[in-house]
Amino acid sequence: MEESASVDSVESLCSSTTTRSDRSSGPKVSDTELRSKGRPIEKMYKDPSKGELPLLPVELVQESAKDVTYICPFIGPIRGSLTVTNYRLFFRCTDREPVFGLDLPLGVLSRVEKIGAATGRGDVSYGLACKDMRNLRFVHKEPDDSLKKSVFEVLMKFAFPVSNNMSLFAFEYKQVFPENGWKVYDPLAECKRQGLPNESWRISKLNDHYELCDSYPATLVVPVTITDDELRRVSSFRAKGRIPVLSWIHPESQAAVVRSSQPMVGQNGRRCKEDEKLLQAIMDANAQSHKLFIFDARPSVNAAANKMKGGGFESEDAYQNAELVFLDIHNIHVMRESLRKLKEVVYPNIEESHWLSNLESTHWLEHIKLILAGALRIADKVESGKTSVVVHCSDGWDRTAQLTSLALIMLDSHYRTIRGFQILVEKEWLSFGHRFQQRVGHGDKNHTDVDRSPIFLQFIDCVWQMTRQFPAAFEFNEYFLITILDHLYSCLFGTFLCNSEQQRLKEEIPKRTVSLWSFVNSQLEEFVNPLYVHYSSHVLFPTVGIRHLQLWVSYYIRWNPRMRPQEPVHQRYKELLAKRAELQKRVEELQREVSSRTASSSSERAGSPTRSITPVQTFV
């Protein structure tokens, strides 16, 4: 799809800048830091061209087979050798020039199954369905030794360790990096950055042991006028005990972004005076507005249907001065089906003659548009309307996380830096209980599980859409986003394991596994956007009309060699960064030279009339 030439749209708001204090905790990544940053003690991957398999520490070969045929959908059958370790699958064909290879973390696999009848007697053919938009197929002979396990059995065992009562590879991987990524996010430090606590908001310890809500973080920010006893009663009224708590506060207007789950009003319109008091306190904490907007992510029909199950939505009669808005974002099942259709359209081959109609039939970009449009409405109410908002869906851990995190990226430039984005993911997704284990299915062979859904993928896709519209507003590049998605599935790091903060602490994830951010922060130069310009007060209002959105080809169609750029984009980024550093150094040298000459000239002309010199500003 081609990018539309038009920039503005009646459906959306244009980008704007507001005068605002800088909350960024720490400077952006400097060129000096990039040059001096320490690298990992051991590289993650060695050079595979020397014949040896590039194994990680504690990665062990479990099975290998020669004379295996990979049925490549792009260039036809390729014969080579296949090796399965406790972490990944290698396929190598050394008869081709250049050497052909596949390197697939087993965590990426969603399904492994024997398929059809192979071409020859004694042959076995099996297909691998992947979570990263690929499907792979291999054919090889069964082992002669009946006691020897087949590659298929080994794959089933190590691709789905949870189903086989085994540990994920992340618990074995012990690579040491210069920085501990588990310390990236400190909730109290993030509160302090936002100016919390203050006269209107307090930090509650009520959930320190996860007794109030086991899917919420230990640190909660709530209005000062609400007691802990009242919070307990609110907890019994909100689905899964997920009470309204602060996500972000505007540094000037004090307008707040608050998240929760649906109220359990049921068919009889049950009310909770403590819940009503809490939402009134949220409104009162913002002196600039006497109104509160409640954004329900669901279609109104779905929200009404939830009343049959005891759920529902806030009545405007019960919540004075509150306005309810439905954002029409569909549930996890609709999103899962949409991604399935998208995979059929983009892999392995694209039907050129029906590309646009086929893409439209998946409704993928329509869903992306609705998520972005919802986040934009939230950001606009907070920034332009100076009004506090409450955001929820049903349980408050899927669509709610998408909306709050995207709105925060639009509102706060700190979250558009590399480290700020890491904090955002840790805060809005991990600490607030997005169910990564259920939605991704780490190590679980039950590929038909109805709890699986690409919720986090959609969020990253929305971020990518914004980086296209505001190429200088984000410190990170596209490769950063793709790396996060690759390791969402890889099970190499512990970052995306489990369903909640409580579960991760119970499983001792920070002690027993390595954080993805340890790896990322050890090689920041790989992920820096050379076009980035730091403006602390810049608020982003992206254009969300469907004609301004694009399919993320570099992610969804990256396995098709016809769609692959001749040179990796992130390699060009690195070259641009090096050139920028070189030019910046030259500018500094010239400025020192000009200053030296000016000082020398001034001393020579002491006592004589002086000329005013207009300084020349240079931008690199």
From Swiss-Prot:
Active site: 393
Catalytically driven reaction(s): a 1,2-diacyl-sn-glycero-3-phospho-(1D-myo-inositol-3,5-bisphosphate) + H2O = a 1,2-diacyl-sn-glycero-3-phospho-(1D-myo-inositol-5-phosphate) + phosphate; a 1,2-diacyl-sn-glycero-3-phospho-(1D-myo-inositol-3-phosphate) + H2O = a 1,2-diacyl-sn-glycero-3-phospho-(1D-myo-inositol) + phosphate; 1,2-dioctanoyl-sn-glycero-3-phospho-(1-D-myo-inositol-3-phosphate) + H2O = 1,2-dioctanoyl-sn-glycero-3-phospho-(1D-myo-inositol) + phosphate; 1,2-dioctanoyl-sn-glycero-3-phospho-(1D-myo-inositol-3,5-bisphosphate) + H2O = 1,2-dioctanoyl-sn-glycero-3-phospho-(1D-myo-inositol-5-phosphate) + phosphate
Coiled coil: 569-601
Signal peptide: none
Residue span, Myotubularin phosphatase domain: 181-556
Location relative to the cell: Cytoplasm; Early endosome membrane
EC category name: hydrolase
SUPFAM superfamilies tied to this protein: (Phosphotyrosine protein) phosphatases II, PH domain-like
Primary residence: cytoplasm
Keywords: Coiled coil, Cytoplasm, Endosome, Hydrolase, Lipid metabolism, Membrane
Disordered: annotated segments: 1-48, 590-620
Membrane topology note: Peripheral membrane protein
Purpose of the protein: Regulates the level of these phosphoinositides critical for various biological processes including autophagy initiation and autophagosome maturation.
Assembly, per entry: Homooligomer and heterooligomer.
Family classification: Belongs to the protein-tyrosine phosphatase family. Non-receptor class myotubularin subfamily.
Protein name: Phosphatidylinositol-3,5-bisphosphate 3-phosphatase MTMR2
Taxonomic lineage from the root: Eukaryota, Metazoa, Chordata, Craniata, Vertebrata
